[in-house]
Design a protein with these regions (language model features):
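Glycine-rich phosphate-binding loop plus the immediately following alpha-helix
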Residues: 123, 156-198, 223-224, 228-232
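Conserved phosphate-binding/catalytic loops in two-lobed NTP-binding clefts
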Residues: 118-119, 273, 290-314
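Glycine-rich phosphate-binding/hydrolytic loop that grips phosphoryl groups
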Residues: 303-341
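A contiguous, well-structured pocket-lining segment that forms one wall/lid of small-molecule binding clefts
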Residues: 194-273, 282-296, 323-326, 343-352
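N-terminal beta-alpha supersecondary unit
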Residues: 8-92, 125, 245
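Conserved phosphate-binding catalytic cores of ATP/NTP-utilizing and phosphoryl-transfer enzymes
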Residues: 2-11, 119-140, 318
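Short beta-strand scaffold segments in enzyme catalytic cores
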Residues: 23-28, 141, 149-153
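Glycine-rich phosphate-binding loop and adjoining helix at the ATP-binding site
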Residues: 82-128, 133
Length: 352
């Protein structure tokens, strides 16, 4: 007598991301196939203020949340009852912005009788790489965003160990501050990147390596050096060499990031180097990493720009890992603006 194998049902996760100034909802299948990824950006709103205003960001999330959820389900062609779970960014991020997403996700989980998966924002950025490639372990991730600059080692799936982090400004924050000093509007990073690659020569600026062997980063001194060059030019009645400063700044940042990332890969025996975060869209950084990894014969994974900036598809990818190893999150979970990546790691016992 033949026994028919039960058909394996796909894991469909509706994910919500509201940690800063993008309202995003996605439907992700089995942690790697994006069925929809709707993003409502607030850049134009915050540009007038020269940066993200937390209260304004929260209000904008509330205004568009329902519409973005409806669009994500419609584009995916998925009915709520087909979903396996609802995932949401629990932290880190702006507390008011996080709360909007968490409340929405809890409401949907209750209304649809689905499990809830609280997800770490940086784990999402890291697992954005799984949307484009199969991950091999151990691996090393260079996280570069507006709020974070870290080197994260993963010896096993979903188990994170931070071996290096910024001691002051995150790299994205440094880009925005330097861009402002050079007269560019918010967000300034893309302007600096474009000008740096067009400049004929670079203004000499320092590289901050910190102690020998350290994987930590520091960008406040470099930022101060840029401001000093700009102010000295103005005091002499001269126009600052904006293009040269942009190139000098970017070369300094990129050299330190690339060198420490490559060293981290070698010292940990990592099989891949992953790049993630909003600054991963920076053309100068991508080109330098690609060139260096080709020379060093290191497998490099970089997501396309749409998965580098904040988006819900990456949250769905990370939530899938959590779901496979740990299951859901209690409905009384709270938004946590200081959420620890290492604490969010899946239990090692679940992998063995």
């Amino acid at each position: 007598m033949k026994t028919e194998m039960a058909e394996v049902q796909p894991v469909l996760i509706l994910a919500i991301e509201t940690s800063c100034d993008e309202t995003s909802v996605a439907v992700v299948k089995d942690g790697c196939e994006v069925l929809s990824n709707i993003i409502s950006s607030q850049i134009e709103t915050h540009r007038a203020f020269g940066g993200v205003v937390p209260e304004v960001a929260s209000r904008k999330h509330v205004e568009v949340m329902t519409l973005v959820i409806e669009q994500a389900l419609a584009e995916a062609g998925v009915h709520p009852q087909q979903l396996t779970a609802v995932a949401v960014t629990q932290g880190p991020g702006l507390v008011g912005a996080l709360l909007v997403g968490v409340v929405a996700a809890k409401s949907l989980a209750l209304a649809w009788n689905k499990p809830l998966i609280g997800t770490h924002h940086i784990a999402g950025h890291i697992y954005a790489n799984r949307l484009v490639a199969e991950l091999k372990y151990p691996n090393m991730t260079l996280v570069v965003s507006g709020g974070h600059t870290e080197l994260v080692s993963m010896e096993q799936e979903g188990v994170f160990r931070i071996i290096g982090r910024t001691r002051d400004d995150a790299v994205g924050e440094a880009y925005d501050k330097v861009a402002r000093s050079l007269g560019f509007p918010y967000p300034g990073g893309p302007h600096v990147d474009r000008l740096a690659r067009e400049a004929a020569e670079a203004v000499a600026l320092p590289r901050v390596w910190l102690e020998p062997g350290s994987y930590d980063f520091s960008f406040s001194g470099l930022k101060s050096a840029v401001l000093n060059v700009v102010n000295q030019s103005k005091m002499k009645g001269l126009e600052p060499n904006v293009a040269g400063i942009a190139r000098g700044f970017q070369e300094s940042v990129v050299e330190v990031l690339v060198e420490k990332a490559i060293r981290a890969v070698r010292s940990t025996g990592s099989r891949q180097l992953l790049l993630c975060g909003g600054v991963a869209a920076n053309g100068g950084l991508r080109a330098a990493l690609i060139s260096r990894c080709e020379a060093e014969k290191i497998e490099l994974i970089i997501p396309p720009p749409v998965y580098c900036t904040d988006n819900a598809a990456m949250i769905g990818a990370a939530a899938y890992v959590k779901w496979q190893h740990s299951g859901g999150t209690p409905l009384d979970m709270v938004a946590d603006p200081g959420f620890s990546l290492e604490e969010w790691s899946v239990p090692v016992a679940s992998i063995e």
